[in-house]
């Protein structure tokens, strides 16, 4: 979710004594903890499904994805469209439950494109730094690499996944009582989206 820093800044401005506990988790864990009632609010990508009407969700934005590499790696391996090929470059990405990883690995499987190996990291800034350093490629939400694409430290590699998007949502269990601080957080998240429309 690209607006989280601005939302958190405004939350702390409006509720300076409010205590907000943040945990980094994958989308499936967020969904499961929301369903179990052990998490108050979660921001996650809705493509994980499996929550039916048990969760109340608010759409925060739909984001395109991009296959990125350093300009040098893109020059060496520009073709991720032709099927049945081995590309000797690592895929640098989050853990296996990462939704954009799953989308790209499904694409590779459908195209019978094999990569050298996978490097798993939890930090998108670290992933981007390795990719910029010619270590491998990654498939990430475009908002997370927009600055690097604009400055030329990363280059996009075309795929047939053009138009693929993921939608970020803010959710809570439908039976969960929303405290004033939780309501403020939800309002800030949804107001940020409305201000852009």
Please name every model-derived segment.
Residues 26-39, 45, 99-157:
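Hydrophobic hinge/microswitch elements
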Residues 8-16, 83-85, 101-114:
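Ligand-binding cleft/hinge of the Venus flytrap
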Residues 56-66, 151-164:
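Short beta-strand->loop
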Residues 75-77, 88-111, 178-180, 186, ...:
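Secondary-structure junction motif
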Residues 3, 157-197:
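A late-sequence structural motif
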Residues 1-15, 19-24, 28-32:
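N-terminal winged-helix
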Residues 54-96:
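Flexible hinge/capping segments at coil-to-helix
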